[in-house]
Amino acid sequence: METIYTFNGEDITMLMCVVIREVIREIAKRENLNFEEAFNDFYRSDTYKTLRETENALWAEPAGYIADMYFAEKQKKQVVCA
């Protein structure tokens, strides 16, 4: 597997893939979406962009916590657009 994500010089690509999958599953479950729909929504989010910045160690948080961040971001955007 190609190294995509690192933290302190260590390859965490596999771990990030697992974390991302679990976050997407949580989003799909809460929103009653299929995996692909949740995948597309999450990958367009600022939360995903933050998660990709591995030095902040957001990837070490539980998937539910990261999903909560995503939903807070989504709610904030809905309020701004309303």
Residue ranges and their predicted role:
Residues 1-82:
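C-terminal alpha-helical interaction appendages
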